[in-house]
């Protein structure tokens, strides 16, 4: 009998101690917004948007002006356009048509060609520093053009005087690498040993690139992290891509992803069915944010292409710690935010409110809402309002 009571007492003590150990989870809490008044000739349809801080610590939001050969810079403090860079299409400093870019400095901005495996390095005056061709690796393998975008978040990156670029998927050839590395000293192009994953049920090569076309990539200073939109797992690679680790990062709100049907798939189904989206690294808090598009229904009268461009109807964001453990997930209200337009600074995560079905939408303004990373005692029950 004494042993019985002793067990009860021990169990009670363990329970009390367990209550003291609070398993803090995290969520994204809505904060203030920031509004940029767009100049009359600046378009709100943005595929490439990146923050930039100059050598004096001055902060800007930069983005390509629609599909024009122009990058605009807005001052984050004044909320006004600070300057713009116009790029010639033809002539001595002609770069052709470009889509996407990466800013190393204002003296070294890398532009990715719209359709060709070419990159131009230019300065803030639009003068060409260098033209880089990456259509064939040093081993003779063909690489495909891929743009440096934020819409599908996979900007190119300069690290240790190497430029890490992407190669669009081509299921017809082998090898089929996701990325390549360009030595900026020698110009050598080396394909990296990480290939596009194969997805069951997506083996029809007649469909252009298949679902592998949609993916996101970020860099934490030590590793590259890939998020394919129709794959639960993320892929973590070493800088040289010789080591690849696969980690499951499943949304609490997605049972399974639904791939577009090769023959009968429509934009409507791509707006309704669940899948994953962009992955961003927050260097200030050492966490990651993975967008998840949740299953929903769309009115048949909706413009599906426009809805796709503006971030669909409803999404959540998974929060991962530095070891890629899920520590929270926040669901966002329908038709309010555009997760295709996000950026991060020392205050938190900014998500654009430029969704055409948002009642406050104005195509003469670019609006971002700040979300701060906060602790919560509740697991997976958080939603942004």
PLM features: residue spans?
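Short, conserved, GDST-rich strand-edge loop motifs in beta-rich repeat architectures
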Residues: 166-174, 290-311, 354-368
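Beta-strand-rich domains and repeat architectures in extracellular enzymes and scaffolds
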Residues: 38-71, 289-293
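Beta-propeller blade signature
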Residues: 176-187, 305-323, 364-378
């Amino acid at each position: 009998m004494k042993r019985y009571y002793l067990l009860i007492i021990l169990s009670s003590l363990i329970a009390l101690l367990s209550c003291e150990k609070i398993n803090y989870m995290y969520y994204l809490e809505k904060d203030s917004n920031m509004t940029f008044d767009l100049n009359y000739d600046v378009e709100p349809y943005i595929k490439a948007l990146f923050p930039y801080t100059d050598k004096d610590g001055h902060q800007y939001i930069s983005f390509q002006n629609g599909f024009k050969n122009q990058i605009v810079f807005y001052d984050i403090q004044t909320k006004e356009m600070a300057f713009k860079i116009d790029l010639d299409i033809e002539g001595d400093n002609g770069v052709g048509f470009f889509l996407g870019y990466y800013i190393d400095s204002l003296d070294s901005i890398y532009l990715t060609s719209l359709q060709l495996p070419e990159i131009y390095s230019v300065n803030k005056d639009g003068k060409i520093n260098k033209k880089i061709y990456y259509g064939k690796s040093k081993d003779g393998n063909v690489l495909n053009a891929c743009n440096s975008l934020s819409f599908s978040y996979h900007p190119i990156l300069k690290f240790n005087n190497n430029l890490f670029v992407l190669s669009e998927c081509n299921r017809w050839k082998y090898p089929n690498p996701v990325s390549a590395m360009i030595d900026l000293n020698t110009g050598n192009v080396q394909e990296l040993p990480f290939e596009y994953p194969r997805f069951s049920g997506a083996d029809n090569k007649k469909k252009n690139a298949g679902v592998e076309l949609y993916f996101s990539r970020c860099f934490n200073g030590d590793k590259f992290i890939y998020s394919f939109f129709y794959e639960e797992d993320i892929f973590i690679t070493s800088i040289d891509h010789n080591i690849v680790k696969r980690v499951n990062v499943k949304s609490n709100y997605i049972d399974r992803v639904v791939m577009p049907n090769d023959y009968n798939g429509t934009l409507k189904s791509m707006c309704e069915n669940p899948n994953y989206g962009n992955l961003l690294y927050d260097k200030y808090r050492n966490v990651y944010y993975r967008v998840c598009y949740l299953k929903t229904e769309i009115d048949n009268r909706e413009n599906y292409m426009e809805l796709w461009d503006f971030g669909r109807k409803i999404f959540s964001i998974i929060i991962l710690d530095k070891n890629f453990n899920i520590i929270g997930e926040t669901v966002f209200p329908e038709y309010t935010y555009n997760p295709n337009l996000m950026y991060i600074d020392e205050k938190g995560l900014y998500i654009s409110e430029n969704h055409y079905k948002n009642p406050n939408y104005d195509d003469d303004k670019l609006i971002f809402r700040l979300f701060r990373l906060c602790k919560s005692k509740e697991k997976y029950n958080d939603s942004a309002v």
